[in-house]
Amino acid sequence: MELHFGSCLSGCLALLVLLPSLSLAQYEGWPYQLQYPEYFQQPAPEHHQRQVPSDVVKIQVRLAGQKRKHNEGRVEVYYEGQWGTVCDDDFSIHAAHVVCRQVGYVEAKSWAASSSYGPGEGPIWLDNIYCTGKESTLASCSSNGWGVTDCKHTEDVGVVCSEKRIPGFKFDNSLINQIESLNIQVEDIRIRPILSAFRHRKPVTEGYVEVKEGKAWKQICNKHWTAKNSHVVCGMFGFPAEKTYNPKAYKTFASRRKLRYWKFSMNCTGTEAHISSCKLGPSVTRDPVKNATCENGQPAVVSCVPSQIFSPDGPSRFRKAYKPEQPLVRLRGGAQVGEGRVEVLKNGEWGTICDDKWDLVSASVVCRELGFGTAKEAITGSRLGQGIGPIHLNEVQCTGTEKSIIDCKFNTESQGCNHEEDAGVRCNIPIMGFQKKVRLNGGRNPYEGRVEVLTERNGSLVWGTVCGQNWGIVEAMVVCRQLGLGFASNAFQETWYWHGNIFANNVVMSGVKCSGTELSLAHCRHDEEVACPEGGVRFGAGVACSETAPDLVLNAEIVQQTAYLEDRPMSLLQCAMEENCLSASAVHTDPTRGHRRLLRFSSQIHNNGQSDFRPKNGRHAWIWHDCHRHYHSMEVFTYYDLLSLNGTKVAEGHKASFCLEDTECEGDIQKSYECANFGEQGITMGCWDMYRHDIDCQWIDITDVPPGDYLFQVVINPNYEVPESDFSNNIMKCRSRYDGYRIWMYNCHVGGAFSEETEQKFEHFSGLLNNQLSVQ
């Protein structure tokens, strides 16, 4: 089996002129397309690479800077042997178009003044630059002259280019003759398994390193090949490390084959995220007809070490994602394996990383530490959802040689940072082939449909359906992840309205139960013998996937601060009785002179995810609550429980049914949902819903609870009715002590906030906070 990276579209190798110190956001296959939308700027950029007039000074242009994507950055120009910047004075969108075309993009989307991507270094080559937009190079635009400026680097200009590339674009490296300073962008590279022991393995871990040049795959001569080169190649394909291999078998194979060698060699330091960041090594020798040869050498071979999660030794290894006993770093909120918000463990508490100076090198250290390859993207701006708790690290700067992110240089001060700047990663992971073993059929778009899986039956591979009985959102999440389609937005137990493949109507999998961490549906628990009484044509499992999902988190501090006891007369609890917010013994309480003891508290539920939280049921299924005078869209939105220390429920009578709305929002975010006037219900991303301690049913009835030590627990979205990017933080726990008159709440925290060791100590913590008893 062969591993591919990108696609060779220009028929040759493209060379990218960049220095190793540049922070590159990602290296993925360029999605060249033949058609592009109309341009809103005039003159309209043309969709081909323009030739530079012979009488114009030759320059190189690149995009650089921090906190950027691959198609944006500070404009830097290579002139007279030195890189410099461009001042933002008189810069325009027309000049930005010229810059973007010069680095291979079809147009500019915008430009940024005042060193938005950080101040550069060296000379400021151009100032007061004026372009019409038709120029083929920035050197053709008028300016004050080379190096004539009154600007400072705080005025360095940046551009944001369209992500669409110019078809067949090739970087011109003729200006720079110092070959060791070149970086190389390979359009196509693969690990080709040679030995029979590796040909049918998933993932492919060993073989020739080959580059596609034109229509031919070519080997790389091993005369200048190093272990550092292997380290980078393995990282590209999702492996954290490389190992030695047996060269004798490959030497025998090479002697029997006619080989075609690539004309270049490469020189990596081992810290690069991709070989396109490596320097170009010495050219290989040529034979009389100018073909590249490898005198006294043979093709370069890599042998990579997969982490346990991707080990090919047996399917039992894939039951759950690999998790060490005490990890120091983890990923949260990502849709795919190997992506998420980066969180680190410090003093027993998990916290996030501020994205200041966050780059691909630091992200790669995280990825390798977790058992993946290098990073293909360093994510900034909490694009994978906001974390909670402390921000442990800021201004992280790794060299790429570190074994752990905590070994890197960083600033422990997080002044000026907030969770809107949480850093994340997308890591390279091995190609396992799981995506080819499941498909969606019959849906209205590629993101939905009946689930069909490929299984072995009587020695043959056949497609079939999955029984929809007990099919839920957790199982749907695994399918969407396996297909690379993000999160599940819906799980369907009936799919009669979707006409799947008629040759896949037989049920081949039933009783599926997933934990949510599996890499594929086949790794979930399921029946050995298929049992689906209702059949799979009408009751086949289905899913709808989405690129984003909400993430609800309860503010534990608010709960701890607002908890108190109230003895409330039964005469004021008639609505609560009707809504079953009191324990069963309340029916025997004197309605005129009796009272109930209520544990009251406020709940502030935040949506820290990437999309709005919407109730599963449509308006037609909402229930009118006469006492509250509004509709409740979710009958079971939360559980409020008081538990004994062994987990037994000791109290009943609490609020479960909810109306969902935006009480407050962060910054400039606008409220979208309200309960009044039969309004739309939900919680907007970046907003929160506040249930104050003084509203009906916002309590637990503890009238019958004896004094003692207890666990207070709140569970949001307990039945997983609405999909979220992270269900682990839906639980909030507190230790509580009740002496018959007062109650103390302490150590309130959401699930996953602390290490496993700290969580175990939680049961035995003796600290107390005093909460007073109020009597009405």
UniProtKB/Swiss-Prot annotation:
InterPro entries: LOX-like_protein (IPR050912), Lysyl_oxidase (IPR001695), Lysyl_oxidase_CS (IPR019828), SRCR (IPR001190), SRCR-like_dom_sf (IPR036772). There is a cross-link at K655-Y691 (Lysine tyrosylquinone (Lys-Tyr)). The gene is Loxl2. Residues 61-162, 191-305, 329-428, 438-546 form the SRCR domain. Mediates the post-translational oxidative deamination of lysine residues on target proteins leading to the formation of deaminated lysine (allysine). Acts as a transcription corepressor and specifically mediates deamination of trimethylated 'Lys-4' of histone H3 (H3K4me3), a specific tag for epigenetic transcriptional activation. Shows no activity against histone H3 when it is trimethylated on 'Lys-9' (H3K9me3) or 'Lys-27' (H3K27me3) or when 'Lys-4' is monomethylated (H3K4me1) or dimethylated (H3K4me2). Its main location: secreted. Residues 550-753 are annotated as: Lysyl-oxidase like. GO terms for molecular function: calcium ion binding; copper ion binding; oligosaccharide binding; protein-lysine 6-oxidase activity. Its cofactor is Cu cation; lysine tyrosylquinone residue. It comes from the Eukaryota. Residues 1-25 form the signal peptide. Its EC number is 1.4.3.13. It is an enzyme of class 1 (oxidoreductase). The keyword Ubl conjugation does not apply. GO terms for biological process: collagen fibril organization; endothelial cell migration; endothelial cell proliferation; epithelial to mesenchymal transition; heterochromatin organization; negative regulation of DNA-templated transcription; negative regulation of stem cell population maintenance; negative regulation of transcription by RNA polymerase II. The modification 2',4',5'-topaquinone is found at Y691. Ubiquitous. Highest expression in skin, lung and thymus. Present in chondrocytes: mainly expressed by chondrocytes in healing fractures and in epiphyseal growth plates (at protein level). The lysine tyrosylquinone cross-link (LTQ) is generated by condensation of the epsilon-amino group of a lysine with a topaquinone produced by oxidation of tyrosine. N-glycosylated. N-glycosylation on Asn-458 and Asn-646 may be essential for proper folding and secretion; may be composed of a fucosylated carbohydrates attached to a trimannose N-linked glycan core. This is Lysyl oxidase homolog 2. GO terms for cellular component: basement membrane; chromatin; collagen-containing extracellular matrix; endoplasmic reticulum; extracellular space; membrane; nucleoplasm; nucleus. Belongs to the lysyl oxidase family. Induction: Strongly induced in hypoxia. Disulfide bonds join C87-C151, C100-C161, C131-C141, C221-C294, C234-C304, C268-C278, C354-C417, C367-C427, C398-C408, C467-C532, C480-C545, C514-C524, C575-C627, C581-C697, C659-C675, C665-C687, C734-C748. Ca(2+) binds at D551, L552, E724, D726, N729, N730. Keywords: Basement membrane, Calcium, Chromatin regulator, Chromosome, Copper, Disulfide bond, Endoplasmic reticulum, Extracellular matrix, Glycoprotein, LTQ, Metal-binding, Nucleus, Oxidoreductase, Repeat, Repressor, Secreted, Signal, TPQ, Transcription, Transcription regulation.
